[in-house]
Regions:
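P-loop NTPase motor catalytic core
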Residues: 1
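Sequence/fold signature of self-assembling virion shell proteins
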Residues: 4, 11-39, 43-46, 50-51, ...
Length: 202
């Protein structure tokens, strides 16, 4: 988000979408995703966004699109029911992941007033991950269990052993902001005009 509006993040609202009914508004969000995905390709010169992380409501909107393909789960797989889970593929170009952790920050989820969010937050995080481990915005440098180094103590010449272990999560040297974009989705469940009961995705 530090990259700023238009580069690091943008907003989308169903009230301002170019659509007459729910399916057309869903397509408008999909069009916004494609535009921002291609802007990532222009910024990083590596490729367009190829994965999406979204809140449950945003994933529900994406799942209604005809381009969405469900991820097949075999019966013998031990699935993880919480956290971030892969839910499918959109248009053959985006792997879609659902983030259920964001919803846990709402006041209705058991948090007290000091730690609760004032309003529900919905978003679409677009990102690019290339074929190489370094071809991404954030790089996980893996944990090395133990490196052992033998040495001699300089004061008494007794044998010593040094142990070292480390890992790191670092930004790409050219900038992590070139690989990601957040679309903040506003006004889900709000009436388009005051005093009406008609809402989009309430």
């Amino acid at each position: 988000l530090n990259a700023g509006s238009g580069s690091g993040y943008s907003t989308w609202s169903p009230a301002s979408a170019d659509g007459r009914w729910m399916a057309e508004r869903n397509r408008d969000l999909y069009a916004k995703i494609i535009v921002e995905a291609n802007r990532i390709a222009v910024r990083n010169r590596r490729g367009a966004a190829n994965f999406i992380v979204g809140t449950p409501k945003v994933c529900a909107i994406l799942e209604m699109l005809p381009e969405f393909q469900w991820m097949q789960v075999s019966g013998n797989v031990n699935t993880q029911p919480v956290g971030i889970a892969r839910v499918g593929n959109l248009g053959g170009r985006f792997n879609v992941y659902r983030d259920t952790r964001t919803e846990a920050q709402l006041a209705t989820s058991g948090y007290d007033g000091d730690n609760a969010r004032a309003a529900e937050l919905n978003y679409v995080l677009l990102g690019y991950k290339g074929p190489e481990f370094y071809d991404t915005g954030l790089i996980y440098c893996p944990y090395i269990p133990v490196m052992v180094q033998r040495t001699i103590g300089p004061n008494d010449f007794s044998p010593r052993v040094g142990l070292l272990t480390r890992y790191g999560v670092v930004d790409n040297i050219f900038g992590a902001d070139l690989y990601y974009h957040v679309i903040i989705v506003k006004n889900l469940g709000d009436a388009f005009t005051p005093g009406t009961t008609s809402v989009y995705f309430g």
